[in-house]
Curated annotation (Swiss-Prot):
Start and end residues of each stretch annotated as Disordered: 676-708
N6-acetyllysine carried by residues: 643
Extra facts: Early fractionation of eukaryotic MCM proteins yielded a variety of dimeric, trimeric and tetrameric complexes with unclear biological significance. Specifically a MCM467 subcomplex is shown to have in vitro helicase activity which is inhibited by the MCM2 subunit. The MCM2-7 hexamer is the proposed physiological active complex.
Name under which the protein is recorded: DNA replication licensing factor MCM6
Residues holding ADP: 619, 622
Pfam family, one: MCM_lid
Motif range (Arginine finger): 528-531
Role played: Acts as a component of the MCM2-7 complex (MCM complex) which is the replicative helicase essential for 'once per cell cycle' DNA replication initiation and elongation in eukaryotic cells. Core component of CDC45-MCM-GINS (CMG) helicase, the molecular machine that unwinds template DNA during replication, and around which the replisome is built.
Catalytic activity: ATP + H2O = ADP + phosphate + H(+)
Protein family: Belongs to the MCM family.
């Protein structure tokens, strides 16, 4: 790769070739380094790597800069300070080294790439003072261009004298010879490029951007174009956080040079008196000097993940095995991972270590932790992909630490993107099609979901997104792909990401009397794509409020002492990377248990008690499977055990069934009856006996008026479930003890009142409790169908007996009813 402005062979014999003595000395010393430097085993370290370069697809040798410093400090300093100048000579030294040992094609070029540079620079630190120096920079790839061939050294044919002019350097734009090399030919502009004899190399342009971690507060992230060549192409995808090793260079800004005004100026030259041009035609070069149309780009020779020891570019790396991950760790680090895997209290310790500054919300912590471990992605025989990533939505009142969860995950995960729903468009979340400034072709620019591929996408204010933007992520959440068909570009891109979303209730406060769907502004398809929903309600509780206040004050006053971590974040990252390599299988026992739990969820969904809960679908079954696999992964198990399924069911049950707990209206039937009476205009009322009027206060004593003003009797959902469970357990116990035992309604009421005898202090309270239990029994019988009144079939005795039977019927439990845990 001829990159430096190496001297061009002279145009004829009158121009001797200029030699660069410093670069030639570097070439000789670098060749000595390749031939003499030995590894820890005493063998020549780079000999085997160089022999692999004879394969057609290989042409780049990766050299450790630390080895170069160890071999010759002066050589390493010269290469670092004069990299762009000496780089072509280093490539020639490599070609000589390979040529001496193997037969290689004459026209094949070889390239050198450096890694393990001691210092890393930010994009913001790249100024003109670093032009030409060997530098390592880091950033996140946001746009990739397609790979195409680049002309690096052209062979031209003079159209006047047919002279062949070889090795004309191309300075990042199409460059013709200044003049024909034939001394008797004065041709300056009529040349033809011979593509068969010219040298081309693979060329790709990517755009990188500063990461959020290194961005100064309140600053807009800066971006830089990176040029990749040869083996470095296609080594970085949109969303990757990578280190690029190479040199900062100056190239002509072709996009500005190709504007209509610039093209017109290239043709306007000052002509002499005889019609000859007084200035030689130098094409765009002269214009570039005049207008200073140049820009900085980074020419990279090596690309590597920013943090390879923690999974590098992503949490999921399919090629890694447990053994390869172990080899990346030190002995002490591996012992720590092994110790964590044997921890009996690992589940709790990981939660507290990951979110040390958030008090309470243990269920949310567990759900987010399982999301980080993730399930096992699968592919069916027909090629259909089943996602393994877990999506979590946190819904809650303001100041319940929703955004803190998102921020913690964003900082912890090696590949996470944090965005706000209101400030994001559909293209910003998925992908945008933009026009390239130079080639004017359409290229794809990655959105948040693509940047978070194989990571976590944290979306705050999820409910504030426009409906059309919500629709854009339907496909990404379930199929984990993004399909684009616009501006002549048709592509299906990967978006294998877990989504952690935070949303506020519609009215600013979660209303327990309404369903989840009524509380948040999300469509049913989006809701069904979330595996876990967590509801955070800001309730007034003296004990909880004191604990939270104490925690916050401790954080402000003694931040170091108040943060108590069992494991450091680096320990958790290492353990997470190791545990994600496990692919647990579902055992037969666990399979039956999962089916049984899903049947319970479905039957409970259809019952009257939880009728307001959102629908339980097959997606919730898949959610249970993913959560079970995640639990097995966390404990480094190769098989999903029933205890893992039980915890997954508990979390799912917490987020689905307990999501809505409205108070139960025990006077519902009476209110409906009153509305019916009002609608009939008093037809069934007592018209013959008008209500007396109190003369002193002028108020009517009509019973119906009294009923209207009286508030309806309501019972908390948890209390209602407790009473119904007590009744069901008692009735079933009676059925088991005696074959023909059935309690009358009055006997059941008396039994309950006797059970709570210690809680009753007055006659008024006794009447109140009796009214409540009677209404609960009535609702369980006529609305929820938990209890069944025995019919009168076969008991047609005396009329007196039948009347008493209907007033006080026998009650039994519905055989299809499943008792809640």
């Amino acid at each position: 790769m001829d990159l430096a402005a190496a001297a061009e062979p002279g145009a004829g014999s009158q121009h001797p070739e200029v030699r660069d003595e410093v670069a030639e000395k570097c070439q000789k010393l670098f060749l000595d380094f390749l031939e003499e430097f030995q590894g820890s085993d005493g063998e020549i370290k780079y000999l085997q790597f160089a022999e692999e370069l004879i394969r057609p697809e290989r042409n780049t040798l990766v050299v450790s800069f630390a080895d170069l410093e160890q071999f010759n400090q002066q050589l390493s300093t010269t290469i670092q300070e004069e990299f762009y100048r000496v780089y072509p000579y280093l490539c020639r030294a490599l070609k000589t080294f390979v040529k001496d040992r193997k037969e290689i094609p004459f026209a094949k070029d070889f390239y050198v790439a450096f890694q393990d540079l001691p210092t890393r620079h930010k994009i913001r630190e790249l100024t003109s003072s670093r032009i030409g120096l060997l530098t390592r920079i880091s950033g996140q790839v946001v746009r990739t261009h397609p790979v195409h061939p680049e002309l690096v050294s052209g062979t031209f044919l003079c159209l006047d004298c047919q002279t062949v002019i070889k090795d004309v350097e191309q300075q990042f734009k199409y460059t013709q010879p200044n003049i024909c090399r034939n001394p008797v030919c004065a041709n300056r502009k009529r040349f033809l490029l011979d593509t068969n004899k010219s040298r081309f190399v693979d060329f790709q342009k990517v755009r990188i951007q500063e990461t959020q971690a290194e961005l100064p507060r309140g600053s807009i992230p800066r971006s830089l174009e990176v040029i990749l060549r040869a083996e470095a192409v296609e080594s970085a995808q949109a969303g990757d956080r990578c280190d690029f090793t190479g040199a900062l260079i100056v190239v002509p800004d072709v996009s500005k040079l190709s504007t209509p005004g610039a093209r017109a100026e290239t043709n306007s030259r000052v002509s002499g008196a005889d019609g000859y041009e007084t200035e030689g035609i130098r094409g765009l070069r002269a214009l570039g000097v005049r207008d200073l149309s140049y820009r900085l780009v980074f020419l990279a020779c090596h690309v590597a993940p920013t943090n390879p020891r923690f999974g590098g570019k992503e949490l999921r790396d399919e090629e890694q095995t447990a053994e390869s991950i172990k080899n990346q760790m030190t002995v002490k680090e591996w012992e720590k991972v092994f110790e964590m895997s044997q921890d009996k209290n690992l589940y709790h310790n990981l939660c507290t270590s990951l979110f040390p500054t958030i008090h309470g919300n243990d269920e949310v912590k567990r759900g987010v932790l399982l999301m980080l471990f993730g399930g096992v992605p699968k592919t069916t025989g027909e090629g259909t992909s089943l996602r393994g990533d877990i999506n979590v939505c946190i819904v809650g009142d303001p100041s319940t630490a929703k955004s803190q969860f998102l921020k913690h995950v964003d900082e912890f995960s090696p590949r996470a993107v944090y965005t706000s729903g209101k400030a994001s468009s559909a293209a910003g979340l998925t992908a945008a099609v933009v026009r390239d400034e130079e080639s004017h072709e359409f290229v794809i620019e990655a959105g948040a979901l693509m940047l978070a591929d194989n990571g976590v996408c944290c979306i705050d204010e999820f409910d504030k997104m426009d409906m059309r933007d919500q629709v854009a992520i339907h496909e990404a959440m379930e199929q984990q792909t993004i399909s684009i068909t616009k501006a002549g570009v048709k592509a299906t891109l990967n978006a294998r990401t877990s989504i952690l979303a935070a949303a506020n209730p519609v009215s600013g406060h979660y209303d327990r009397s309404k369903s989840l769907k009524q509380n948040i502004n999300l469509s049913a398809p989006i809701m069904s794509r979330f595996d876990l929903f967590f509801i955070l309600v800001d309730e007034c509780n003296e004990v909880t409020d004191y604990a939270i206040a104490r925690r916050i004050v401790d954080l402000h006053s003694r931040i170091e002492e108040s943060i108590d971590r069992v494991y450091s974040l680096d320990d958790i990252r290492r353990y997470l990377l190791f545990a994600r390599q496990f692919k647990p299988k579902i055992s037969k026992e666990s399979e039956d248990f999962i089916v049984e739990q899903y049947k319970r969820l479905r039957q409970r969904d259809g019952s009257g008690v939880t009728k307001s809960s959102w629908r339980i679908t097959v997606r919730q079954l898949e959610s249970m499977i993913r959560l079970s696999e995640s639990m097995a992964r966390m404990h480094c198990c190769d098989e999903v055990q029933p205890k893992h399924v039980k915890e997954a069911f508990r979390l799912l049950n917490k987020s689905i069934i307990r999501v809505e707990t409205p108070d139960v209206n025990l006077d519902q039937e009476e209110e409906i009856q009153m509305e019916t009476d009002e609608g009939q205009g008093g037809v069934n009322g007592h018209a013959d006996s008008p209500a007396p009027v109190n003369r002193f206060n002028g108020s009517s004593e009509d019973a119906s008026q009294e009923t209207v003003s009286k508030p309806s009797l309501r019972l908390g959902f948890a209390e209602y479930c407790r009473i119904s469970n007590l009744i069901v357990l008692h009735l079933r116990k009676m059925e088991e003890e005696e074959d023909e035992s059935a309690l009358k309604r009055s006997e059941l009421v008396n039994w309950y009142l006797k059970e709570i005898e210690s809680e009753i202090d007055s006659e008024e309270e006794l009447i109140n409790k009796k009214t409540i239990i009677e209404k609960v029994v009535h609702r369980l019988t006529h609305y929820d169908h938990v209890l069944i009144e025995l019919t009168q079939a076969g008991l047609k005795g005396s009329s007196e007996g039948s009347e008493s039977y209907e007033e006080d019927p026998y009650l039994v439990v519905n055989p299809n009813y499943l008792l809640e845990d």
